Amino acid sequence: VELGSTAQVGDIKYRDLNGDGVINADDQGMISEYGGNPRIQYGFGLNINYKKFDLGVFFNGSAMRKIMLTGIHPFGESDYNIFKFVAKDYWTEANPNPNAAYPRLGLQKANSDNNVVPSTFWMRNGNFLRFKTLEIGYRFCRYGRIYVTGDNLAVFSPFKEWDPELEWYKYPLQRTFNIGCLLYTSD
């Protein structure tokens, strides 16, 4: 293998795509024609009024989206911390699980570069549906309304490591709740 460093037990295995018996840069190909850009972004909402009550909801999401786990690799000499999801299931000599979720860790860049080559191994499904906003209100008189709102209430996604809408190093979107009262001066 000539993709970064000499392959060792516990490393990611690569395919000889061009069939020449050598795994090198000539065996690399496009793995996602859209990269991290989703092919579909969507949003939908609903507002309902019934007597003195009102309800509003909004959802947004992304489909046909891929996430590359780049920059998270706990390999080499760069003082990287290890993400919990990597630390829970990686290959070691003490636990040589051939089905470990992540390859062996390396302390020296020279002997672990094989595990950081961009490949489908690091690609994840980044589809998500976010329950973005909920607002419930009550008009208690002709000139007044009380309400409660919630933002970023839930995210449904097969990708569980972090918010699929953001990169791993970004501060996550906060879940917020508000209670308010509106007083109108006229119709």
Model-derived features with residue positions:
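Conserved small-residue
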Residues: 1-36
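Extracytoplasmic gating/loop element in the C-terminal half of outer-membrane beta-barrel translocons
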Residues: 7-11, 62-145
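Residues that define the transmembrane beta-barrel architecture of outer-membrane proteins
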Residues: 38-42, 123, 127-132, 173-177
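Outer-membrane beta-barrel architecture
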Residues: 45-47, 135-137, 149, 180-182
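Transmembrane beta-strands of outer-membrane beta-barrel pores
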Residues: 50-52, 61-65, 133, 150-157
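Repeated loop/turn-to-beta-strand initiation elements of outer-membrane beta-barrel proteins
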Residues: 52-56, 142-146
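Transmembrane beta-strands of outer-membrane beta-barrel proteins
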Residues: 58-60, 147-151, 182
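Conserved small/polar residues in nucleotide/adenosyl-binding loops
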Residues: 184-187
